[in-house]
Amino acid sequence: MKYIDDINLFKSNKDFVAEIDMTGSLGRIYHYPQRMEGCLFLLCLRGECDITIHLSEHKIQKNDIVTILPETFVHVHRQSPDCRLYLIGFNKELLNGINLFNSTMNYLSALIDTPIIPLRPEITELFQDYFMLLIKMKRM
């Protein structure tokens, strides 16, 4: 598995990133508060992670999906050693090009207020399949 440890997770020459964090990479990248340069989705498959998103503290646990919007400040305080996160991130320029925020304007305040949503295990499996598809596409 690729070891991601780059502060600039969203490079301008890539439309999206897709990885599995099995080594605590997210915590190393965001070990102090930083602005999210793209839109990041996290899917927690096991373990837990203490994180501050947009000045609010949260705990990510198994079967949680997390949405971190661009320009949001993020700080990972702790990742348990067994934490497994799927990460899918989209470059800000890509999102601007497809007018994502215009079509989701009604939901933005809800995503800011509630960035973490617990899922039923069967729904987590569906998201896991989708994340794996994007991970495989990225490697092509």
Tell me what each language-model feature is.
Residues 44-46, 69, 79:
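A short, compositionally biased micro-patch
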Residues 109-140:
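Amphipathic alpha-helical segments enriched in hydrophobic/aromatic residues interleaved with Lys/Arg
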Residues 68-69, 90, 119:
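A conserved hydrophobic position in a structured secondary element of the catalytic/binding core
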Residues 55-69:
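Short acidic-glycine-tyrosine-enriched beta hairpin
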Residues 1-59:
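Generic protein-terminus/edge-of-domain signal
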Residues 83-84, 96-112:
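A short alpha->loop->secondary-structure connector
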Residues 72-93, 99:
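Ligand-binding loop in jelly-roll beta-barrel domains
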